[in-house]
């Protein structure tokens, strides 16, 4: 890093977090031949420090637009070292090397170097961290915080439009990209994914319906009535077979039960209906986790508010997180084909197209 870049880094670090966040990861940091990487931190409202990883093109002199990541549900880090084999990591590395753009990522509490415990963090706490990071963008002298593109992956593709709270913050956003997002209630999503899961498990059609009846009771009591899964299963032990986590009745997909009760209280349809900027809404042909209809609805809601602003794209042979599969059965089994980098080009072409348009 050159002296001028080092001075800029120290200035930014002082404005965002007064004390350097210790590194927990044992692997190499991110690095790129054509981009600088800054490891910083943002302090969330509850006082926990969250790792921020920012990339910017070498020799940047003017302020640049920024791609701001709203991440997935799982407790996986956003860090994407050069040797990553993770598909979303490969996509993020592609975005980090896009000429003319910065990339801003944070690790949620307890992920990567961030303080906290991901397995005990509810969604409202996680969202507050993203909002703090969004507001910190103005502290970086190389970022044009009036030109923010929010990229939401999976769960982040659902709640992306909740990050900018005020009218002024919404005016800072130039566009959205989502991959495998959602917009229905979480209760509806759980019934959708369970129906697909049971079918892909090769249950007979009648068995799928019986299992969905049980899942409907279980998820209604948990998500809508606010009861614990252990309490429900103690009362109705016959529902135990439909609970995806087996004996762990306090977590789902590594997150606490309250995380999903928070999601159930959201109104994402209302949030996306307020969006007035361009949106690229992507869904994989072989995404069995998030349904195609959710992504179509996001595009529909944006277009109802700003006709022609949103574009829905069904990406052939793509899975939930950008993976390349040859069939839905392969996607369910996790049997990946070699990564197809065309998804990166789809995103960067769209970003460059938006930048050629006049702001506002």
What are these regions (language model features)?
Residues 120-140:
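Alpha/beta-hydrolase active-site loop
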Residues 21-62:
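N-terminal cap/lid segment of alpha/beta-hydrolase-fold proteins
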Residues 275, 281-283, 287:
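Short beta-strand/loop motif that positions the catalytic acidic residue
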Residues 89-113:
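Conserved alpha/beta-hydrolase
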């Amino acid at each position: 890093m050159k002296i001028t870049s080092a001075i800029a880094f120290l200035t930014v670090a002082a404005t965002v977090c007064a004390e350097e966040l210790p590194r927990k990861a044992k692997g190499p940091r991110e690095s790129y031949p054509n981009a600088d990487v800054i490891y910083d931190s943002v302090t969330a409202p509850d006082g926990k420090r969250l790792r921020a990883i920012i990339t910017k093109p070498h020799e940047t002199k003017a302020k640049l637009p920024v791609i701001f990541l709203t991440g997935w549900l799982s407790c996986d880090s956003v860090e994407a070292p050069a040797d990553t084999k993770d598909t979303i990591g490969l996509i993020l590395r592609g975005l980090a090397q896009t000429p003319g753009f910065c990339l801003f990522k944070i690790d949620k509490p307890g992920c990567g170097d961030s303080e906290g415990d991901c397995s005990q963090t509810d969604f409202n706490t996680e969202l507050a961290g993203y909002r703090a990071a969004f507001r910190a963008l103005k502290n970086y002298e190389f970022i044009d915080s009036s030109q923010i593109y929010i990229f939401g992956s999976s769960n982040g593709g659902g709640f992306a439009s909740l990050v900018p709270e005020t009218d002024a913050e919404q005016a800072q956003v130039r566009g959205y990209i989502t991959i495998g997002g959602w917009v229905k209630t979480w209760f509806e999503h759980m019934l959708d994914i369970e129906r697909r899961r049971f079918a892909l498990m090769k249950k007979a059609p009648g068995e799928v319906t019986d299992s969905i009846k049980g899942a409907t009771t279980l998820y209604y009591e948990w998500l809508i009535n606010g009861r614990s899964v252990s309490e429900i299963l103690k009362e109705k032990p016959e529902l135990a077979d439909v609970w995806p986590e087996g004996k762990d009745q306090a977590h789902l997909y590594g997150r606490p039960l309250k995380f999903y009760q928070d999601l159930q209280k959201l109104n994402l349809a209302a949030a996306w209906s307020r969006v007035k900027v361009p949106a690229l809404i992507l869904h994989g042909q072989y995404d069995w986790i998030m349904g195609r209809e959710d992504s179509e609805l996001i595009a529909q809601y944006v277009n109802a508010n700003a006709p022609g602003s949103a574009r829905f794209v069904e990406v052939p042979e793509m899975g939930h997180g950008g993976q390349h599969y040859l069939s839905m059965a392969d996607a369910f089994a996790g049997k990946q084909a070699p990564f197809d980098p065309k998804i990166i080009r789809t995103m960067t072409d769209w970003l460059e197209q938006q930048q050629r348009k006049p702001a506002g």
